[in-house]
Structures are given as structure tokens and as C-alpha cells.
């Protein structure tokens, strides 16, 4: 190997000569970390350890809802170590976004962007560990379309990251190589690192600041999947239709007013087949409030239908 090469390998050691592209890239990443770190705070919200948050708008911190275990006595550790009080403006479990208010006192606001990510794109996960910057380097492992969380929230794109995300960095920033905050990092199933895109965050922030909560459609019925044996019997009795079982009716709720009964099986929503509880949760988004829905049912082995006006309730 020629000594004129920019990277010289000695066993497991890599020596990078001054002026090499690799060294320039390393310096650029370090500069991005330094520049972004001033907009990231540590959030003390009652968990086993602090998480992170992003100064999204002036006086507004965005963090991961799932790690915020209390609604009051929330503290922030700002870059440099200063501690500030924060109050909860609202939380949305369906998108994993919580919004805090605080006195910024000159703390810079993150530069955010709604970026279209590609698999293989290099990104940084930025957090705050008791006032000190925390960073992880990796790539976008999966870039998919819109999806629905288990709580029924709409996430504008599915972004999975190939990087090691510290629990202390959850709720922190996903940063591109232009220094823009393009999402919030969270830990998903099997502790995989995911990102909530900035467009989803902006939508949640607008609603939380305006109303203090995220309101969703309200059916007023408790649903659960049918056991396999019962599902098979009901399917045979109703032409192989599947559905979800009604196990509770809220008094004076939309379903009660429409005449739904415990033991009914919901098989369709405006003609669309229903087989899982999650499908109903997805359909009860904010846009469903006030709408009239035709539900297909099985009652006593016979098919019937009900018309229900969807109500409104805040997400708990």
C-alpha cells in the first residue's frame, strides 16, 4: 500500500492524513453536533433516567410522550447545565409527542425541516445528557410510507434507523447532514430506533398548543378480538364474515344511542370489512368526529346494521 494513500492501515489502526475527505467529513459531523446541541435539552419527567427534548419553537419543547411519566414538577437541564422549570402543554399518546412550555432565555430554536429520507442516508441522533451533548451516528435503514400507531395515530412516514439510541437520547433530534432537525428519535418495538417525522410533530404541536390535547372519534363501545373458536362458529353462521366483539357499551355514548348491544359483533364500517380492533382505532381519528357511520353487525347469528354518529373525546 502506498504511503501517498490518504488512509493508512496498520493492523486494526487507521491513520488518516491531514486534508483527507474522511477527516473533513469527521470535522463536519462534529460541527453539526456542536451547532445542534444548543437546541437539545434533558427532560426530567419522572422516569428512571432523564430523556431528551427539542426546542421546537420559542418557549416550546417537544419530547417523547411515552417517557414522560408525570404531568407536573417537570425539570429541564439546558445545554451547559442550567436547570429550568417546564409545564406540560399537552400530550398525544397516538403519535408519541408531548409538548412542554418553558422560559427560553435566549436558548436557540432548532432549524426544522420536512425532509424526504432515503434508505442509506447518513443521519445523527442528538440528545442531552445532564447538560452535555449526546450523539449517535448511523443511517436510515427503512423509509416507508404513512402508518398508524397501535393507539391509532397517523405517522406520516415510517423511518427506522440503524444506530444505537441511548434511552437518554429518546425524545431528541434526528439531524441530517445539513444540520436540520428532521424528526424526533424514539425507541420502538424490540428497542429499535425510530423517528417521528417533523411534519407529524408540527401537526401534533399545533393541536396540543391550541386545545391542550388531541381529540379523537368516540364510539362508546369496548371491543376485543374474538376467540378463534367463537370466530369460526360465528363466521359459519353469517357467511364467513369476521369481526370484533362488543364487550362493553358506555351509557349515553354513541353506540348506546344507536342501539348497539354487548355481544354484537362489528363486521363492517361503511361497507369496509372489519377484522381487528386496531382497524377500528385507525378509523376513529380526529376527522371521524361528527361523522355518521353505517356499521355492519352480527347479532344472534344474523346480520344487521346500525347507524352511529361518532362522538368526541380527548386522548387519555
Segments the model singles out, each with a brief description of its role:
Residues 37-39, 98, 102-111, 134-191, ...:
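Active-site region of chymotrypsin-like
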Residues 60-62, 182, 255-278:
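Conserved PDZ fold ligand-binding element
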Amino acid at each position: 500500500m502506498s504511503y501517498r494513500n490518504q488512509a493508512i492501515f496498520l493492523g486494526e489502526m487507521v491513520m488518516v492524513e491531514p486534508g483527507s475527505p474522511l477527516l473533513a467529513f469527521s470535522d463536519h459531523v462534529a460541527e453539526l453536533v456542536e451547532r445542534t446541541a444548543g437546541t437539545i435539552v434533558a427532560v426530567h419527567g419522572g422516569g428512571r433516567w432523564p430523556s431528551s427534548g427539542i426546542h421546537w419553537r420559542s418557549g416550546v419543547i417537544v419530547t417523547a410522550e411515552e417517557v414522560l411519566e408525570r404531568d407536573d414538577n417537570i425539570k429541564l437541564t439546558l445545554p451547559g447545565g442550567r436547570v429550568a422549570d417546564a409545564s406540560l402543554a399537552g400530550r398525544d399518546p397516538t403519535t408519541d409527542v408531548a409538548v412542554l412550555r418553558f422560559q427560553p432565555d435566549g436558548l436557540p430554536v432548532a432549524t426544522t425541516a420536512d425532509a424526504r429520507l432515503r434508505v442509506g442516508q447518513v443521519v445523527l441522533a442528538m440528545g442531552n445528557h445532564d447538560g452535555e451533548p449526546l450523539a449517535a451516528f448511523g443511517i436510515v435503514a427503512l423509509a416507508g410510507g404513512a402508518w398508524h400507531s397501535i393507539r391509532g395515530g397517523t405517522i406520516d412516514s415510517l423511518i427506522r434507523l440503524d444506530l444505537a439510541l441511548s434511552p437518554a437520547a429518546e425524545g431528541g433530534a434526528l439531524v441530517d447532514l445539513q444540520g436540520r432537525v428532521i424528526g424526533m428519535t424514539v425507541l420502538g418495538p424490540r428497542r429499535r430506533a425510530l423517528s417521528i417525522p417533523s411534519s407529524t410533530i408540527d401537526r401534533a404541536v399545533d393541536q396540543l398548543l391550541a386545545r391542550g390535547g388531541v381529540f379523537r372519534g368516540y364510539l362508546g363501545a369496548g371491543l376485543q378480538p374474538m376467540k378463534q373458536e367463537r370466530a369460526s362458529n360465528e363466521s359459519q353462521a353469517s357467511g364467513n364474515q369476521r369481526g370484533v366483539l362488543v364487550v362493553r357499551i358506555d351509557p349515553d355514548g354513541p353506540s348506546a344511542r344507536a342501539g348497539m348491544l354487548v355481544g354484537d359483533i362489528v363486521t363492517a364500517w361503511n361497507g369496509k370489512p372489519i377484522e381487528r380492533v386496531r382497524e377500528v382505532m385507525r378509523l376513529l381519528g380526529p376527522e371521524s368526529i361528527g361523522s355518521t357511520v353505517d356499521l355492519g353487525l352480527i347479532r344472534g347469528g344474523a346480520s344487521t346494521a346500525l347507524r352511529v354518529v361518532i362522538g368526541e373525546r380527548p386522548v387519555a
